[in-house]
Amino acid sequence: MSFSRTEAAPAATLPDLAATLAAPRDGAFLQLGAAFLTRQPAAPLPAPYVVGFSDDAARMLGLDPALRDAPGFAGLFCGNPTRDWPQASLPYASVYSGHQFGVWAGQLGDGRALTIGELEHDGRRYELQLKGAGRTPYSRMGDGRAVLRSSIREYLCSEAMHHLGIPTTRALAVIGSDQPVVREEIETSAVVTRVAESFVRFGHFEHFFANDRPEQLRALADHVIDRFYPACRDADDPYLALLAEATRRTAELVAQWQAVGFCHGVMNTDNMSILGVTIDYGPFGFIDAFDAKHVCNHSDTHGRYAYRMQPRIAHWNCFCLAQALLPLIGLHRDAPSEDARAERAVEDAHAVLGRFAEQFGPALERAMRAKLGLELEREGDAALANQLLEIMDASRADFTLTFRHLARVSKHDARGDAPVRDLFVDRDAFDRWANLYRARLSEEARDDAARAAAMNRANPKYVLRNHLAETAIRRAKEKDFSEVERLAAVLRRPFDEQPEHDAYAALPPDWASTLEVSCSS
């Protein structure tokens, strides 16, 4: 583990770790200055205890997983010791704004998250952020706390998405407390330690654009380019290149969401990462019975963030990012006037945004081709995949199990169809599609066994279904955290058979259909 110009051994004790986190480092977000953030200690969390811990995330950070058992671990990762840190080492909350449900909402956060420092390992730097660490100057009406329920969901989904191969923030730990907080009912507090190379959002850029602060806007863009998109610095227009890269990553990310049936639930612009990673797990959900119009957030009464809408919303959010970057685009070129520069900037930004569909479509087609076990590219492959989704929608066939069981279908005959066919109400419709699928498979050189193995590497058996998370949460509320870690362990091997855990891959029980998730966390 190291920091910028200083090499250091991995933190072996909690005091070492605390000192490392608090050390100043070159190029960190906090060096942007007071216009971007406020330093403050975390609010005390009484009698904290460990609810969940990711050995895998710890190793990514160069930490010894045994640290979780050290006295004071829970205290450090709910922020309690930060009250005694010097002013120059205090955690910070950053300021950002954004659009919520398509409407400009102004300043939004960080309302309950404090970044406590950075760690570097294997040449990569990571920020550690405590979500639920108390009120900040940007909290608006909130109490600054997160609840155990939502914190467990974020921890589990962060780990699940990472092991599905989808870019995401990570979760090192969940720390709980019996401190009560009021939501729709009385719940208990928790803090999630989130990990990412950066927590900069589209909303950070929107904040400085909306407040007419061009110097800060440019400083933020330069920080992101220099730290995360260095190749953009060599482009003819670095800021246009930044927009292009962020748009491309966003398009490819949402294609990966669609391919596993993941609904984010609240794709506001302040919940969009400039690095194109999944961030802010709130009212998310993996689709069970497939419905393209599925809305996982019961607060989303108009279905703005439905599954089928996610690509369109991601594109719209990129337009918001582009608008925020317009004052910077073209600054490196000579223009006869500011009006001419601005007019050209709009044209260039539109050209970048116009490529979103060209990036999203092929990314989704590649993913769907892998899910169908197709190596060769054929013109009708996208139509074949869409036809499957249509009959899945009509029968409300389980999304995850349908694709997983497709691996059993033979290219020669229908003997292996039963497991997937039985998921459909309209089995004649499936039979018609399966005949088309078999005809397409006949063009492939791979035998059934090789294709099935490849498909099982593309189609997870295990995803974080809402009822699985709910079961773990209910037990955790009774101070039994074993199911949280058991479920996390299963989700870290989503493509493996794990026959001893078949129950986690089964169709949801009837009571799962009554579960609702919302922005209340």
UniProtKB/Swiss-Prot annotation:
One Pfam family recorded for the sequence: SelO
Could you say which residues bind ATP here? G109, G111, R112, K131, D143, G144, R194, R201, D280
- State which Enzyme Commission number(s) the record gives: 2.7.7.-, 2.7.7.108
EC category:
transferase
Record: residues binding Mg(2+): N271, D280
Record keywords, A-Z: ATP-binding, Magnesium, Manganese, Metal-binding, Nucleotide-binding, Nucleotidyltransferase, Transferase
So what family is this one in? Answer: Belongs to the SELO family.
Function, as annotated:
Nucleotidyltransferase involved in the post-translational modification of proteins. It can catalyze the addition of adenosine monophosphate (AMP) or uridine monophosphate (UMP) to a protein, resulting in modifications known as AMPylation and UMPylation.
Q: What is this protein called?
A: Protein nucleotidyltransferase YdiU
Q: Which gene encodes it?
A: ydiU
